[in-house]
Amino acid sequence: CRTDPTAAKHKGISILIVDTRDPGYSWTPIILSDGAHHTNATYYNDVRVPADMLVGEENGGWKLITTQLNHERVGLGPAGRIAGIYDQVHTWASKPGSDGVTPIEQDAVKRLLGQIKSIWRINELLNWQVAASGETIAVADAAATKVFSTERLQEVGRLAEEIVGGYGNPADSETAELLVWLDKMTKRNLVITFGGGVNEVMREMIAASGLRVPRVTR
């Protein structure tokens, strides 16, 4: 909340912990496109918070917010998300289908799996770069990791569905289950493109903070 109304817009902000038992606090669930419920919209009506619920320094909230956002952006871009899709599809493709054909023996399947694995490895390098930076993560590095991973995840989902949908038989129970899982992952992974800040804003942050390009005038 703003604790110094006279300060500049990024100053005078403090973080306070709100007791959710306060009668002025309420929430409603946010249901995602895949039907999952991971987060909520919260509301504060005449909520009063004791001063001893302050987190960190008074008027020092913006630094905490930006630090948390950097960690959130990195957390939204782990290589493990892509690795999980690759492992599931690679395992499926390595088994003979109901027609006796093993999908991974097809050149097109090998090529598509290779594309997924190359994206996975690049994402790993970005993760390692951020991990090597220590406690202080550069804004541009966190944003770049998030943009690359969340957008490449959409591509990985399409490639995976192309493999399973194109070289599998949906009448086969294992293939059908994998297609349902991939569909859920595709919908769920779309949401993270705007978690921690939409990617259009992330690109501006990369340009301004990482490349020192003048900020866009608004």
Task: Give the ranges of each region predicted by the language model.
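A short core secondary-structure module
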Residues: 1-28
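Short, glycine-/Ser/Thr-/acidic-enriched flexible segments
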Residues: 4-6, 21-23, 32, 48-49, ...
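Short glycine/proline-enriched turns and hinge-like loops at secondary-structure junctions
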Residues: 8-12, 56-57, 198
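Tryptophan-centric aromatic hotspots in well-structured domains and transmembrane helices
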Residues: 15, 39-43, 62-65, 92, ...
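Glycine-rich beta->alpha junctions and the first turn(s) of the following alpha-helix
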Residues: 19, 25-123, 192
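Glycine-rich phosphate/cofactor-binding loops in nucleotide/flavin-utilizing enzymes
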Residues: 62-71, 75-79, 164-218
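C-terminal helix-coil-helix/basic helical segment that borders enzyme active sites and/or dimer interfaces
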Residues: 94, 98-104, 110, 120-175
